């Protein structure tokens, strides 16, 4: 299918889930009415980023996929507006919790769930306390409009994940994100590095990349962090073709002909000339 319009939504969030969901709904509808068929929103957008510190009260936010308010909302919106809409949510499954994506196709059906594989554990990003790592591997979904691969935030720093999704047939890579300041390094700004690593995935795999980040300063549990927005879209060469500011609500748009991009990947020969027999070290633990 030629000329598919995609969108990236950038927003700020607070501690009121209903308000956050209303903001998301408004922007998703706006993007859909402007012709977007695949729409990406940030990581865990129902709440403030609660992983700054370890606090057991936040486990009350975890819901099963059937209970999750954001999954319910996104299913309704996907069906009504005929859009592909990945839903990032705090998933509870039995006694375990995950940082998950429910991939929702344009008919409102859930195609499957991806659970974040790479879980950070640093100052201001205490995710290992909250989330078990996903172990089912990286997934690509054959949606109505494109074959879509999704990594969640810290996954975006690992080229292996992007390459696996490309080898599984992904035509576009999506990265919902929550990234900003480092509380122990107040003068450090990772924004450019963050963008470049995903631009590299786009260029190395000749796939467009969408990255959606939250923005604004959030203070909870006696710790403050500023999320720097700067959401962006790249083309298949890694060139940024749309970018949001460090703050402010925004919707970014781009249009891709995925059949044409497939021909360019064939022409360039990156996958033809791979030498997997030489890459054993990549899968070893050192």
Curated annotation (Swiss-Prot):
GO terms for molecular function: citrullinase activity; N-carbamoylputrescine amidase activity. Its EC number is 3.5.1.20. It comes from the Bacteria. It catalyses: L-citrulline + H2O + 2 H(+) = L-ornithine + NH4(+) + CO2. Keywords: Hydrolase, Virulence. Is a good candidate for development of an efficient and cost-effective enzymatic-based method for preparation of ornithine. Residues 4-258 form the CN hydrolase domain. It is an enzyme of class 3 (hydrolase). The active site is at residues 43, 116, 153. CDD domains: CPA (cd07573). InterPro entries: Aliph_Amidase/BUP, C-N_Hydrolase, C-N_Hydrolase_sf, N-carbamoylputrescine_amidase. Disruption phenotype: Deletion of the gene results in loss of CTU activity. Loss of the gene does not affect acellular growth, but it impairs intramacrophage survival in resting as well as gamma interferon-stimulated macrophages. Mice infected intranasally with the mutant show significantly reduced bacterial burden in the lungs, liver and spleen compared to wild-type Schu S4-infected mice. Mice infected with the mutant succumb to infection, but they survive longer and show significantly extended median time to death compared to that shown by wild-type Schu S4-infected mice. Pfam families: CN_hydrolase. One of its GO terms (biological process) is putrescine biosynthetic process from arginine. Catalyzes the degradation of citrulline into ornithine, carbon dioxide and ammonia. Contributes to intramacrophage survival, in vivo growth and pathogenesis. NCBIfam families: agmatine_aguB. Belongs to the carbon-nitrogen hydrolase superfamily. This is Citrullinase. It comes from Francisella tularensis subsp. tularensis (strain SCHU S4 / Schu 4).
């Amino acid at each position: 299918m030629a000329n598919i319009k995609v969108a990236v939504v950038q927003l700020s969030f607070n501690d009121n889930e209903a308000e956050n969901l209303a903001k998301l709904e408004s922007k998703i509808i706006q993007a859909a009415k402007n012709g977007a068929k695949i729409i990406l929103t940030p990581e865990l957008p129902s709440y403030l980023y609660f992983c700054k510190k370890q606090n057991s009260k936040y486990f009350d936010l975890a819901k099963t996929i059937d209970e999750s308010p954001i999954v319910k909302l996104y299913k309704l919106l996907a069906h009504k507006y005929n859009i592909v809409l990945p839903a990032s949510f705090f998933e509870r499954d039995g006694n375990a919790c995950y940082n998950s994506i429910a991939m929702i196709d344009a008919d409102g059906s859930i195609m499957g769930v991806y659970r974040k594989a790479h879980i950070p554990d640093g100052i201001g990003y205490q995710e290992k306390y909250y989330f078990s790592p996903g172990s089912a591997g990286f997934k690509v979904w054959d949606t109505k409009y494109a074959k879509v691969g999704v990594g969640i935030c810290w996954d975006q720093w690992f080229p292996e994940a992007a390459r696996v999704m490309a080898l599984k047939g992904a035509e576009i890579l999506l990265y919902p994100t929550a990234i900003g300041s480092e509380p122990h390094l107040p003068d450090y700004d990772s924004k450019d590095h963050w963008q470049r690593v995903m631009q590299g995935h786009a260029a190395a795999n000749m796939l467009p990349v969408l990255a959606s980040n939250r923005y604004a300063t959030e203070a909870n549990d006696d710790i403050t962090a500023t999320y720097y927005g700067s959401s962006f879209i790249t083309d298949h060469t890694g060139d940024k073709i749309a970018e949001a500011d460090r703050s402010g609500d925004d919707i970014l748009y781009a249009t891709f002909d995925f059949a044409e991009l497939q021909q360019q990947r064939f022409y360039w020969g990156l996958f033809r000339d791979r030498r997997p027999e030489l890459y054993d070290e990549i899968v070893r633990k050192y």
